[in-house]
Amino acid sequence: SQIEAQLSSCPIYARLIDLMTEAARGFHADFVSGGERRDFFFSMPVARRLGLGHLSIFKDLSTVYTDAQGVSMDSASAGLAGKRSVHIADLITVASSYVRAWIPAVRALGADIAYSLAVVDRNQGGGQILADAGCPLTTLVTVTPDLFETAHRMGRITQKQLDLVLAFIADPDQFMQDFLLAHPDFLSREIAKGGKNAQRAELCITSGFAPQAALPR
């Protein structure tokens, strides 16, 4: 498969999968789940190495189950009721995909996501949301100020960039509101682009996050 070819050709990717497999093994889950679509690059090889089935979850909440022998089938007939998964993700921000799609899709099959395993936690509240949802998060990397302060000392980022990042980490909501107020045409321009840009801008508006002065006229 393409994933196996990438594992063979990229030592960093292979080592990452080794680390995730080691972490996932300790959960003793019944199967592995992953969400469309970046999660699949991590969840599928980990499932294969653990000898477990894999539940592919799509954004429309549809699912496909592939057993440990590589046979794909209708998830409803896969006997997942009462089973527990470890859901493997690339990145956790505020866990919105879990809340909107991954958790409901697994529960619709009578199963539960019992554990979450991610490569990176951006440390923006997603971990607490997952804990409250009953699928506590384990991560290989958590984004903290130390990461960016080290990058600054190494000359990878400027002082201005460091200041911006630290301000965002300290209060992401206030940072974004200040940004929108400083760029009052930003949401209008994003909506005009269409596609995902428009969807994100409209979500920002409908969620009540955008300040009144930053709303499209």
Predicted regions and their residues:
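PRPP-associated nucleotide enzymes
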Residues: 1-89, 93-217
